[in-house]
């Protein structure tokens, strides 16, 4: 299982937890990695939110539990040398999708629709059962109410956002390419 490019260059550890017998089926491998501060959290000004978390490992775990109906049972946090760490299982069942043969627009649309339904289903059942009090209401119901208040405007809003986001991503990529090609990124 990959640990994400945000963790590149940081220490991480894989730990084998031996099960109750010699059978491999009851062994578990967990990883511990340093949790990073997301860019958006630097702009959070509400002291109640900022002070809610012990460290970035704690924030990451609480967020994952709130977003996933069936979070990893080994999901947790700890601290090593004063740095917040994320703890999770290295799943023996996790596999990447093989996108190599997916080139037909109709097949792509069907896969995207299936992935969207799976993601929505996983997320929609999660926040009420997270066991945390940071958000004292059901985000699912709040989102549903916001959409219901202007159902006709929802799809155009998403389309406008997607186009704006795409334009920003392309512009950012162009800036990166210009800097990279002109040797203006130290260390690369």
Residue spans for each PLM region:
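Conserved ATP-binding subdomain of kinase catalytic cores across diverse folds
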Residues: 1-188
């Amino acid at each position: 299982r990959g640990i994400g490019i945000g963790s590149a260059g940081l220490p991480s550890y894989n730990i084998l937890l031996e099960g109750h017998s010699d059978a491999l089926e009851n062994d578990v491998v967990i990883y511990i990695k340093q949790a990073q501060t997301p860019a958006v959290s630097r702009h959070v000004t509400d002291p109640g939110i900022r002070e809610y978390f012990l460290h970035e490992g704690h924030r990451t775990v609480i967020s994952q539990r709130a977003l996933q109906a069936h979070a990893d049972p080994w999901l947790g946090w700890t601290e090593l040398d004063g740095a917040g760490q994320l703890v999770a299982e290295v799943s023996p069942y996790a596999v990447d999708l093989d996108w190599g043969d997916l080139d037909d627009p109709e097949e792509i649309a069907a896969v995207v629709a299936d992935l969207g339904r799976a993601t929505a289903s996983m997320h929609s059942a999660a926040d009420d059962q997270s066991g945390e009090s940071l958000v004292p209401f059901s985000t699912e119901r709040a989102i549903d109410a916001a959409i219901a208040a202007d159902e006709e405007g929802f799809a155009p809003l998403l389309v406008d956002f997607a186009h704006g986001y795409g334009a920003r991503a392309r512009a950012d990529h162009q800036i990166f390419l210009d800097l990279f090609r002109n040797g203006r990124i130290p260390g690369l």
